Swiss-Prot record:
Parts forming coiled coils: none
Region (Important for interaction with RAB11A): 326-339
Ribosomal protein recorded as keyword: no
Function: Downstream effector for Rab11 which regulates Rab11 intracellular membrane trafficking functions such as endocytic recycling, intracellular ciliogenesis and protein export. ATK1-mediated phosphorylation of WDR44 induces binding to Rab11 which activates endocytic recycling of transferrin receptor back to the plasma membrane. When bound to Rab11, prevents the formation of the ciliogenic Rab11-Rabin8/RAB3IP-RAB11FIP3 complex, therefore inhibiting preciliary trafficking and ciliogenesis.
Domain of life: Eukaryota
Region (Binding activity): 1-163
Compartmental location: Cytoplasm, Cytosol; Cytoplasm, Perinuclear region; Endosome membrane; Golgi apparatus, trans-Golgi network
Gene3D superfamilies: YVTN repeat-like/Quinoprotein amine dehydrogenase (2.130.10.10)
Assembly and interaction partners: Interacts preferentially with the GTP-bound form of RAB11 when membrane-associated. Interacts with GRAF1/ARHGAP26 or GRAF2/ARHGAP10; the interaction connects the endoplasmic reticulum (ER) with the endosomal tubule. Interacts with VAPA (via MSP domain) or VAPB (via MSP domain); the interaction connects the ER with the endosomal tubule. Does not bind to other Rab and Rho small G proteins.
Pro residues bias (residue ranges): 225-248
Name the UniProt record assigns to this protein: WD repeat-containing protein 44
Modified residues (Phosphotyrosine): 474
């Protein structure tokens, strides 16, 4: 058989010496110098040689396959002729391969298997010699001299070319389907046995009927090299990681949490919503998707944690931060490390009188401040310590009151009253200083001091109600006064007191709220207890409701120890039952004893809020908000804050949410069923004290009032800043904003009523943020007094620091006043039934419920008798009144509570 002539780069080897091509030995240590100099050219030559050799081998293998197809189809004669022709035509250096393969296929068909096995064994031995493994590297280096005797390489280029040829042959052998390794690396690899082995391990040709495309097209496709099997000494491949589930699609705006709360005109542009918002809409909609109830119920209110901490954005605050905020600042120490006493701390804090500029230590402020006229509330004292300022009562005394008092005449002692007025100014309206003066001047001065006391406290010596020991008689008239220049007719000059609830509250009553139905009244204040009062005609209904949920003293599941003790103390103190005798008059609307008492707070209560289904929220100076229900005795949930909670409000349309404002400067919208903060925002500015909060426009906006006189509006859907109003006068001492004490919406007119510590009440139009009306006449310099509307929004009422209850008409009656400013209302009516600061005054939301059946029958007869009572009261805003009955409630600094009824023919 003729030897095969190999095609190489840079020349061809002699035909008679194929051994130099087959057996190669890598002399890396000896040829380092040559390789270093020719490294880059050799790499380029390797790439070119590899490409050309691969193309030659692929082309020849395709020709072999074509010849085999032709030989199967043709006869024996044609087969021999084609083999001879293909052998004689040799266009390239590998032209002898098809002829040799064809001859070997016919002549040595019987001995192919044996020869191929021998060839494979010899090839494996030669391959191990030429390509030693990593484990046999040392052995290959030891036998380097023996290999050099068998192989001679003339130059570095020939060595590289031979190496490339060997690698290409190895790649061709790997492509075999059986996986046998065939490496023609020796001179025997060029023998006829190797050709037979290559022919045997060549890829099997598929049947003709399975080959849809022509041979020409198939010959142009290069076979894909098979991937060699992984080494056995390596671990199995790591399985692919589990596929992460696709994120859920973003919810539409209609599916957000507060979409149900939106009004048609509450459309916040998307551009105005920052991407780094305090709480995204997806976070805000986590709970509402699960909630399908339109309002709060007992099941959702009692589920979950009983104590909820303020966690904004769903992140729990740091433990150290919470501990420091809850425990408050540590007691200051001296330079030597000793803790300062209370007296030293008070002496170190300086308070500045904004009117006179005088600075005094806080330890002496009690003597300087007017304790007799305007006792400071605990909240006011706390804010004063933080802001280091106070406002004297003299500066904020109403001008109208001074004018009125100057015109008052006393037939028995007009000259004495003039002297006492001068003495008041000299003494600074301080009874304590007057007593010191009385000790010096004897009995005569004592008599003057008593007169001063009567004048300062607006008490009458002949009035039996001035005595603390005697009870207030029912249906008795009260002291009435009106603004200077207001000549009448008056609306409340015939008002009478019908019930006195003094004796229950121990200390001041800071807040009172009627339920939406008007049958329940909640009052709370300095004694840390919430008291619920029920109307006589509604007592049985609520008592049956309580008995339904508290049969045999049963309380809610998993109550806290505090709740159990609260229930026990509530029962021991004897809450009124249906069988109790009520000694009061039949005209009294409420029972004389509370329906129930809620205990749990550890400091003064500041605000209350009712839901439409008899849930009650209470906020306190103990930095908590507690949730109650009229059918339960214990606290349902406690919401903890960072600082004093000054204001709370249920959402008007979805009482699963409520708003809370705190002195820490944060406004929070709580989700009661989920027991978490749904949305929150923080006030900007130097003074971040929130002193009032409420909803307006039926829940469209949340409004807060600050200590520096700002009303800030936030859209409820995202609790984002909307706008603000700076509540202050344009000139005078009130041009600096004062503390906002109350915010009340005026439904149907897009207006809000703002009460502030500058002794002014303002009505703002939310359409253009303009001032619609300013009311003045009362005194509110440092208290938490707030004004509120009547049930039909015709009147507004407020307590005062001068012990009077002040009432204004919401709008001027043009039939009474001809030339008045439409944006000023100085025409007030005042009633007096208290001997201390009136801390709270409200109208009853449903006056008809306050009257018994007998009184209502008398009312019908009275309407027929007094037809003037049905005269329509047409005001400038179109408010029409069909009933002039009004019921008021007021409370003072001593805990006394009085009920008033305005209707002349009901109580003669």
């Amino acid at each position: 058989m003729m030897p095969l002539k190999m095609c190489t780069w840079g020349g061809s080897y002699p035909v008679g010496s194929p051994g130099k091509v087959g057996l190669l030995s890598f002399k890396e240590t000896k040829n380092t110098g040559n390789k270093a100099g020719n490294e880059s050219p050799v790499q380029e030559l390797r790439q070119d040689v590899s490409k050309k050799i691969i193309e030659c081998i692929i082309e020849e293998s395709q020709k072999v396959l074509q010849l085999e197809d032709d030989s199967l189809d043709s006869k024996g004669k044609g087969l021999s002729d084609q083999a001879t022709a293909s052998h004689s035509v040799a266009g390239t250096e590998f032209s002898n391969i098809p002829g040799l393969l064809a001859i070997q296929h016919e002549l040595q068909q019987g001995s192919r298997k044996a020869d191929s096995q021998n060839a494979a064994e010899e090839t494996e031995l030669e391959t191990q010699k030429c390509f030693p493994s990593d484990n046999n590297c040392e052995k290959s280096e030891k036998t380097e001299d023996e290999t050099n005797n068998l192989t001679e390489v003339s130059s570095a280029d020939q060595l590289d070319a031979s190496k490339l040829e060997t690698e290409i042959l190895n790649k061709e052998a790997v492509e075999v389907k059986e996986g046998d390794v065939v490496n023609p690396a020796s001179s025997d690899a060029l023998s006829t046995k190797d050709f037979a082995a290559v022919e045997e391990v060549a890829p099997a040709k598929p049947p003709r009927h399975l080959t849809p495309e022509p041979d020409i097209v198939a010959s142009t496709k290069k076979p894909v090299p098979a991937r060699p099997p992984p080494p056995t000494n390596f671990p199995p491949p790591r399985p692919p990681p589990p596929s992460r589930p696709a994120p859920p699609p973003r919810k539409k705006k209609s599916d957000l949490e507060f979409e149900a709360l939106k009004t048609p005109d509450l459309d916040v542009p998307k551009d105005n919503i920052a991407s780094d918002s305090l709480l995204t809409t997806n976070m805000a909609s986590e709970s509402t998707v699960r909630d399908s109830l339109p309002s709060l119920d007992l099941a959702s209110a009692t589920s979950g944690d009983k104590i909820v901490t303020a966690q904004e954005n769903g992140k729990a605050p740091d433990v150290q931060t919470v501990a420091g905020e809850v425990m408050g600042p540590q007691r200051p120490r001296s330079n030597s490390g000793r803790e300062l006493t209370d007296e030293e701390i008070l002496a170190s804090v300086m308070i500045k009188n904004l009117d006179t500029g005088e600075e005094i230590p806080l330890s002496l402020a009690e003597e300087k401040l007017p304790t007799g006229i305007n006792p400071l509330t605990p909240l006011t004292l706390h804010i004063m310590r933080r802001t280091k300022e106070y406002v004297s009562n003299d500066a904020t005394q109403s001008d109208d009151e001074e004018k009125l008092q100057s015109q008052q005449t006393d037939t028995d002692g007009g000259r004495l009253k003039q002297k006492t007025t001068q003495l008041k100014k000299f003494l600074g309206k301080s009874v304590k200083r007057a007593k010191h003066l009385a000790e010096e001047y004897g009995e005569r001065a004592i008599n003057k001091v008593k007169s001063v006391r009567d004048e300062v406290f607006h008490t009458d010596q002949d009035d039996p109600s001035s005595s603390d020991d005697e009870g207030m008689p029912y249906t008795r008239p009260v002291k009435f006064k009106a603004a200077h220049g207001f000549k009448g007719p008056y609306d409340f000059d015939q008002i009478k007191v019908v019930q006195d609830l003094s004796g229950e509250h121990m200390g001041a009553v800071w807040t009172m709220k009627f339920s939406h139905c008007g049958r329940l009244l909640a009052s709370a204040g300095q004694d840390n207890i919430v008291r619920i009062w029920a109307l006589k005609n509604a007592f049985d209904y609520f008592n049956n409701m309580r008995m339904k949920y508290n049969t045999e003293g049963r309380v809610s599941p998993s109550p806290s120890q505090e709740s159990l003790s609260s229930s026990k103390s509530d029962t021991d103190m004897g809450v009124c039952s249906g069988t109790d005798e009520d000694p009061d008059d039949k005209n009294a609307p409420f029972r004389q004893r509370p329906f129930c008492k809620y205990k749990g707070h550890t400091a003064d209560l500041l605000d209350l809020s009712w839901s439409k289904n008899y849930f009650l929220l209470s906020s306190s100076m103990d930095k908590t908000v507690r949730l109650w229900h009229i059918s339960r005795r214990e606290c349902l949930c406690c919401f903890q804050h960072i600082d004093f909670v000054t204001a709370i409000a249920f959402h008007p349309r979805d009482d699963r949410y409520f708003l809370s404002g705190s002195l820490d400067g944060k406004l929070r919208l709580w989700n009661i069923p989920d027991k978490k903060v749904a949305l929150w925002n923080e006030v900007d500015g130097q003074t971040k004290l929130i002193t009032a909060a409420n909803f307006c426009q039926n829940g469209k906006y949340a409004v807060i009032g600050t200590y520096d006189g700002r009303c800030i509006f936030y859209d409820t859907e995202h609790l984002k800043y909307h706008t603000q109003i700076h509540v202050r006068s344009t000139r005078g001492r009130n041009k600096v904003g004062r503390k906002i004490t109350g915010i009340e919406p005026l439904p149907g007119e897009n207006k809000i009523l703002v009460t502030s510590n500058d002794s002014r009440i303002r009505l703002y139009d939310l359409r253009d943020l303009s001032l619609s009306m300013k009311y003045k006449g009362y005194v509110n310099s440092s208290s938490q007094i707030k004004a509120s509307f009547s049930h039909d929004f015709t009147y507004l009422v407020s307590g005062s620091e001068d012990k009077y209850v002040y009432i204004w008409s919401t709008y001027h009656d043009l039939s009474k006043f001809t030339s008045v400013r439409r944006d000023r209302n100085d025409f007030w009516e005042g009633i007096k039934a208290h001997n201390a600061v009136v801390t709270s005054a409200i109208f009853a939301p449903n006056p008809s419920l306050m009257l018994s059946l007998d009184v209502q029958s008398e009312k019908l007869e009275g309407i027929d008798k007094y037809e003037d009572a049905e005269v329509l009261d047409n005001t400038s805003t179109g408010i029409v009144k069909t009933d002039n009955t009004e019921v008021l409630l007021s409370a003072d600094f001593t805990g006394a509570q009085c009920f008033y009824v305005k209707n002349s023919f009901l109580y003669p």
